[in-house]
């Protein structure tokens, strides 16, 4: 009898594993990967842009820090509004389907998504800040930022692909090309504008 109960418990655990709702995981993964990539690329691009016209490390770091704070706040607010809108839609849908009853534990939390997005953005933004903080030579600093951002993009791209069960190589190529383009365009345009004294 006891062995039958054990078998029943094992079967129930297997059923729970096979019926696991991956939509929550996808929501968190999307917010975390987007936040980290955005923090990494936007802060690095901002620092590279300022670096194109001002070689002072202090100005570059202050600009990067301002970008970190503004970006983390923006990501948190945007994610909160987005997830709250989704939450409202899903609650209304559940009420229509079940006659007024809702199972709110299945729904994503807007506050948690906002916090996760802000933390992920901050984590990404810290990479170029730390890379630039200890290098005084301008050209070396730019090279170190690009190298650190490239390494972080590879890590974030790989992690996102593995957790999301997506093709790793395609994910890495997309992430790397996007990051490099953003930094190159920002640097180039700022250099162009700065050289004309605007």
Swiss-Prot record:
Coiled-coil segments: none
Pfam families per UniProt: VIT1
Topological domains annotated Vacuolar: 54-60, 136-141, 196-198
Major localization class: membrane
GO MF annotation terms: manganese ion transmembrane transporter activity
Induction comment: Not down-regulated under iron deficiency.
Keywords: Ion transport, Iron, Iron transport, Membrane, Transmembrane, Transmembrane helix, Transport, Vacuole
Regions of this protein lying in the Cytoplasmic compartment: 1-32, 82-114, 163-174
GO BP: any one term: intracellular manganese ion homeostasis
Stated role: Probable vacuolar iron transporter that may be involved in the regulation of iron distribution throughout the plant.
Family: Belongs to the CCC1 family.
Record-linked PANTHER family: FE(2+)/MN(2+) TRANSPORTER PCL1 (PTHR31851)
Protein name: Vacuolar iron transporter homolog 4
Organism of derivation: Arabidopsis thaliana
Lineage summary: Eukaryota, Viridiplantae, Streptophyta, Embryophyta, Tracheophyta
């Amino acid at each position: 009898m006891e062995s039958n109960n054990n078998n029943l418990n094992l079967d129930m655990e297997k059923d729970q594993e096979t019926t696991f709702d991956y939509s929550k995981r996808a929501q968190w993964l999307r917010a975390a990967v987007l936040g980290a990539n955005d923090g990494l690329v936007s802060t690095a691009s901002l620092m590279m842009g300022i670096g194109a016209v001002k070689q002072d490390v202090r100005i570059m770091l202050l600009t990067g820090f301002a970008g970190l704070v503004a970006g983390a706040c923006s990501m948190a607010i945007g994610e909160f509004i987005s997830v709250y809108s989704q939450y409202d839609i899903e609650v209304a849908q559940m009420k229509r389907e079940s006659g007024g009853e809702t199972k709110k534990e299945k729904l994503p939390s807007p506050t948690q998504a906002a916090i996760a997005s802000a933390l992920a953005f901050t984590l990404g933004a810290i990479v170029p800040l730390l890379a630039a903080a200890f290098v005084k030579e301008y050209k070396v600093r730019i090279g170190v930022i690009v190298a650190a951002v490239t390494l972080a993009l590879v890590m974030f791209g790989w992690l996102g692909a593995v957790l999301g069960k997506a093709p790793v190589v395609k994910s890495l190529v997309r992430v790397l090309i996007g990051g490099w383009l953003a930094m190159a365009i920002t640097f180039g345009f700022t250099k162009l504008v700065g050289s004309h004294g605007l």
